[in-house]
């Protein structure tokens, strides 16, 4: 497993090429799938949550029938623990499009890791009331966790480091730093799901503090890559345990 992950996550500028912007989505911005999922996220998920009702309503808004669910379900494995495949695609769409938006921000000029990290956190603000459900889906054991959730978390970490021009680390330390950034993002989402402060001020403060903790590791990114994956898995397990406690 770790050899496969090494190939996927070793630094590669092709990962940031314009032609690959929407990978691993299997459709473009002008496709019905993209339009329906975007509409669902913007208009219906904040109220209804990540479910088929949000997708069907979005499809209806745009003049598409409920048959769009079949097209959206195609790229994913059969439903896991009562989570429909189309809903898994909606979650994937959310993760990918919000990550891709970081490239647009970076194109405007020099940006820091903190600026990009906070932008990604802010992108989840409209869904704050649905983050508990989102994190539950992301942490479900199975193919979606291995093939989508964890790879997307690592792609997010990689993009944050790449676009901010952060000092990077070679070889094994490369994995550890990305695991730490991914953990910071996951824990910030978990905090936001329970934050009741005005304008989510405490979440933003928490996000800055977690990012500072990543920076404070400095040259300590010398753990083996298995430990990096272990740490991220522990973060996902922490999410599951916290969600179970309510």
Curated annotation (Swiss-Prot):
Residues 1-58 form a transit peptide. It comes from the Eukaryota. GO terms for biological process: ubiquinone biosynthetic process. A 1,2-diacylglycero-3-phosphoethanolamine binds at residues 175-178. Keywords: Lipid-binding, Mitochondrion, Transit peptide, Ubiquinone biosynthesis. Pathway: Cofactor biosynthesis; ubiquinone biosynthesis. Pfam families: COQ9. One of its GO terms (molecular function) is lipid binding. It is found in: Mitochondrion. The keyword ATP-binding does not apply. GO terms for cellular component: mitochondrial inner membrane; protein-containing complex. Its main location: mitochondrion. Membrane-associated protein that warps the membrane surface to access and bind aromatic isoprenes with high specificity, including ubiquinone (CoQ) isoprene intermediates and presents them directly to COQ7, therefore facilitating the COQ7-mediated hydroxylase step. Participates in the biosynthesis of coenzyme Q, also named ubiquinone, an essential lipid-soluble electron transporter for aerobic cellular respiration. Belongs to the COQ9 family. This is Ubiquinone biosynthesis protein COQ9, mitochondrial. It comes from Eremothecium gossypii (strain ATCC 10895 / CBS 109.51 / FGSC 9923 / NRRL Y-1056) (Yeast). The gene is COQ9.
């Amino acid at each position: 497993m770790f050899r496969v992950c090494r190939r996927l996550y070793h630094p590669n500028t092709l990962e940031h090429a314009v032609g690959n912007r929407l990978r691993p989505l299997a459709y473009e911005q002008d496709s019905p799938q993209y339009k329906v999922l975007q509409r669902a996220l913007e208009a219906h998920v904040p109220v209804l949550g990540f479910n088929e009702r949000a997708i069907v309503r979005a499809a209806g808004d745009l003049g598409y029938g409920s048959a769009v669910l079949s097209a959206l379900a195609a790229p994913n494995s059969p439903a896991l623990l009562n989570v429909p495949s189309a809903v898994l695609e909606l979650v994937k769409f959310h993760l990918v499009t919000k990550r891709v938006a970081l490239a647009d921000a970076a194109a405007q000029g020099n940006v820091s890791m903190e600026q990009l990290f906070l932008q990604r956190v802010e992108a989840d603000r409209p869904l704050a009331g649905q983050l508990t459900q989102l994190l539950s889906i992301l942490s479900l054991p199975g193919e979606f966790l291995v093939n989508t959730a964890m790879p997307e978390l690592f792609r997010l970490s990689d993009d944050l480091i790449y676009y901010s021009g952060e000092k990077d680390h070679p070889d094994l330390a490369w994995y550890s730093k990305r695991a730490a950034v991914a953990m910071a993002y996951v824990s910030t989402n978990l905090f936001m799901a329970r934050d009741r402060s005005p304008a989510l001020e405490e979440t933003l403060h928490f996000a800055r503090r977690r990012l500072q903790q990543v920076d404070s590791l400095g040259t300590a990114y010398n753990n083996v890559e298995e430990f990096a994956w272990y740490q991220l898995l522990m973060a996902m397990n922490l999410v599951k345990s916290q969600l179970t406690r309510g």
